[in-house]
């Protein structure tokens, strides 16, 4: 559950409908963020993947280094998935810190023709990696200490997810599902503090499951914390 308080004096001074709409948006967006966080924690945990479906980059293989090979790493990841399920990954989630490195990487920039902007865009990345759905994980949440942190870390997740359509069945291979109770999403209100404060509450019941880890691949450690630009020719971090 997530709740948003509205003081009765605040409600009297504001336009009631707009204030309640704002409160509803806040709590529903909060639930969506909680869902994304639960999914991100699940798919960024190396323990949920077989050895053949994950890699932890280190040293000069990290994408800070100009001589690293992101295209080769992605190709190997795609091969690992296709060997397990006979399907290539069609979805990729890139953490924000990993995206900052990829879009400036010399190898990928070298694939852009001279008459184009020398910055790798998301559409170009889809062409280079031959993956139709690429999403940059930019969401931020507040941890238990009140610090704002990224939900998606310096990781890249590849997955095969069946496209929605009439031909899709429950037997199709898929990386993960969220099981949600029917009609579980509910918005209601209640009062506290002697009826002086009204709360708009959103409730949802769901559980994400990593049902087909063999249909996914986790690339961790994209960012080398010991990177030294003085030792690198062609600094990716410029």
Please provide the spans of the model-predicted regions.
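Helix N-cap / beta->alpha transition motif
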Residues: 5-9, 94-96, 212
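Intrinsically disordered or highly flexible coil/loop and linker segments, enriched in small
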Residues: 36-40, 87, 134
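Short, glycine/acidic-rich hinge or "gate" loops at secondary-structure transitions
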Residues: 38-51
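Long, hydrophobic/aromatic-enriched structural stretches that serve as scaffold segments
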Residues: 1-38
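Sequence/fold signature of self-assembling virion shell proteins
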Residues: 12, 19, 60-68, 109-238
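Short loop/turn segments at secondary-structure transitions that flank enzyme active sites
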Residues: 33, 37, 98-100, 206
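Short acidic/polar capping segments at secondary-structure boundaries
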Residues: 28, 32, 44-45, 97-99
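Extended, solvent-exposed, turn-rich assembly/linker loops in the middle of proteins
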Residues: 49-132
